[in-house]
Every structure is written in C-alpha cells, then in structure tokens.
Regions:
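Short hydrophobic beta-strand that contains or immediately precedes a catalytic carboxylate
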Residues: 16-20
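Short acidic, Gly/Ser-rich segments with clustered Asp/Glu that frequently serve as metal-coordination loops
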Residues: 21-25
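C-terminal accessory helical subdomains adjacent to catalytic cores in phosphodiester-
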Residues: 1-14, 26, 30-49, 56, ...
C-alpha cells in the first residue's frame, strides 16, 4: 500500500522594513504590519524597525538586522528621506541594495525626495513642484481638514487608516512622478518617491 503524501508546509514570505524615522514611518508601516501579520500569517510576515539612522548607516543597520533573523528575510526595504543629506550618500544606498541582493534576499531602496510626507500628499492629488519639505506639512493639514481628519503631525499614528481609501490615487501619482524622473538618481528626482513600490508589493494583502 502506498503511503499518503505528506503535506508540504510552505513558509511565509518574510519582509523586513527598516525606516530612518522613528515616528512617522514606523506608525504608517506598523499599521500595515498589524493588518497583514494578523490576517495572512501563513502567507506573508512583516517586521518594521524605526532605527533613527540615515542613508548608508541605515542600510548597514538593515543588513545586520536581516542577518540576525533565523527565519531569513526574502525582502528588505530601506525606507529613507533624502532631506539635506549628501547626494552621494542618498544615491549610494540604491547601489548598495543592488550589489547586496541575491537569489535568497532582495534589498530595496525606498527613498522619498524630500520626505515621506510627499507620499502622503500624493493621496490627494498630483504634485510636481519642488518645494521645501517644511511646506508639505501645512499642505497636508489643508488636505486632511477637507476630509474631516484634523491637522497633520509627524507623530500621528492613524495616517495609514486615514489615507487607505486614496491609496490607488497615490500609487498612480507616484508612478507619474517616477516616469518624469526616469533616468535621474534619487538625489536629483525632485520631487519623487519609491514608497509606492513597497505599497504595491503589499497591496494584495491590504
């Protein structure tokens, strides 16, 4: 008599998200982590770290965190703002991600020029103006008040849930900026953001 085949247990796909910020980005991606890890534990698992480092040091920290996980991460996302950091450091992270990626683990540079608030603003409309990041916050407050969501603050913990209904708009607008910035390095893509690539990867679970 033939023995019954044993069920093959498929491991979930592990993602590590390491952010430069310790408030805004961890709160936004932490909300995504909570939803996905709760609803799809057998398919995909996320871990979010807000470490406070920037550009190259952020990449090195992400690489170290990835090594420390016994499960092994399939994707490591390095989320950072360009702010006023040296252009060579901003662009070097992209190169490091490419150089360090293998068949087992893929590193992604998720930059925003100038800051993640650009990604938030793109939920409400297309914006191509190269303005200083300090001008994003009053614009965000204006947009949020129009939908009855109050004022913007970097330590708000509800931004993902507020913006979720407008996610498709943000992705489309970010892709339009990406097309305009084609061929430019992150430091020259003003404005621009790659957050949409991470969100698109996770969107089937949201």
């Amino acid at each position: 008599m033939n023995k019954p085949d044993r069920a093959i247990k498929i491991r979930p796909e592990y993602h590590l998200i390491v952010t430069e910020g310790t408030d805004t980005e961890p709160a936004y991606f932490g909300a995504i982590q909570e939803i996905i890890n709760k609803q799809y534990p057998e398919k995909i698992q996320l871990k979010v770290f807000g470490v406070g480092d920037n550009t190259i040091s952020l990449f090195e920290k992400a690489k170290q965190l990835a090594k420390e996980n016994p499960n092994g991460y399939r994707h490591v996302w390095i989320v950072y703002d360009t702010d006023d950091f040296p252009a060579v450091h901003i662009d070097r992270v992209v190169q490091l991600c490419t150089e360090s990626s293998t068949d087992e683990i893929e590193y992604h540079a998720v930059w925003s020029n100038q800051c993640i608030e650009l990604w938030f603003l793109l939920h409400f409309g297309f914006m191509q103006s190269d303005i200083h990041r300090s001008e994003y916050w009053p614009k965000l407050t204006e947009c949020l008040k129009k939908i009855g969501a109050g004022e913007y603050a970097k330590n708000r913990t509800d931004m993902y849930h507020i913006l979720r209904p407008y996610m498709d708009t943000a992705v489309a607008n970010a892709k339009s900026l990406d097309a305009i910035n084609y061929g430019k390095t992150p430091s020259k893509a003003t404005p621009g953001t790659k957050v949409y690539e991470l969100v698109e990867r996770l969107r089937p679970y949201l």
